[in-house]
Amino acid sequence: MQPDEKEIVKSELLVVTGLSGAGKSVVIQSLEDIGYFCVDNLPPILLPKFVELMGQGNPSLQKVAIAIDLRGKELFKSLIHEMDLIKSNSDVIVDMMFLEASNERLISRYKETRRAHPLNGNGQRSLIESINEERELLTEIKSLANYTIDTTQMKPKELRKRIGDYFNKSNVQTFNINVTSFGFKHGIQMDADLVFDVRFLPNPHYVDELRPLTGEDEAVYKYVMKWKETNIFYEKLIDLLKFMVPGYKKEGKSQLVIAIGCTGGQHRSVALAKRIGAELNESFDYNVYVHHRDAHVESGVKHKDEKN
């Protein structure tokens, strides 16, 4: 680089969409708090013009987040076409985040806020019908996202922390790996890219002194790891993940969600997720996060997110 040349830093655009009630407002507020210029409910047809403005070097538009939802139902249909257009702009880095949650959680949130669903403005259909229609309409949009977050088990504080972990950084492009334990009886991890079932492993639930503990406790961890089948499975899975992870990054994904499931999400999946997260953190120069979704549901112990 010549002395009088300045390094060109590309502007960044994050399009935030997803199911109504899944947390778009929390995400936009969180991004605004860390310095993003945020726009709520921009019609998709205006995206190319907005990206053109970003590419002109306006410092206030260096990092932009735009929330788009189905309130303008007919206008929303053009989003896929507009996303193809703006991703061809070499001056701006374009990402998409998709937020989702289970029907039960969305219904609960709507009952708490007493707001009408955007697809039920005339009040002539049930809430669940509106949610199901929206989920179907967004199926193709979801496939475009390189960030997908399932907020079913998240409180607003936890979602804000996740957004901060992802985006409160320098302009260096990063790759995030989320290793999540969960219990099948509480529902599958909806935003998972990879799901592994460890219910075939010996279960600490049937050991009286281990039953109230979680896989984060040393006694449970040692119990799960002492079995031959556990270690064979672990070694094979780590080999597979070390092969797959670079491929996901090469294909342009910004995050990879690996979900480890057992019956209740308290013992086996927690122990395996903890060990897998530690190994991936040692093996890759990426951000690795470990989250135990259901451990607190079964044990009564409040869970915490870990960053390796």
Curated annotation (Swiss-Prot):
It holds the Pfam family PapZ_C. Keywords: ATP-binding, GTP-binding, Nucleotide-binding. The keyword Nucleotide-binding applies. GTP binds at D69, L70, R71, G72. ATP binds at G18, L19, S20, G21, A22, G23, K24, S25. The keyword Protein biosynthesis does not apply. GO terms for molecular function: ATP binding; GTP binding. Displays ATPase and GTPase activities. Belongs to the RapZ-like family. This is Nucleotide-binding protein SSP1952. It comes from Staphylococcus saprophyticus subsp. saprophyticus (strain ATCC 15305 / DSM 20229 / NCIMB 8711 / NCTC 7292 / S-41).
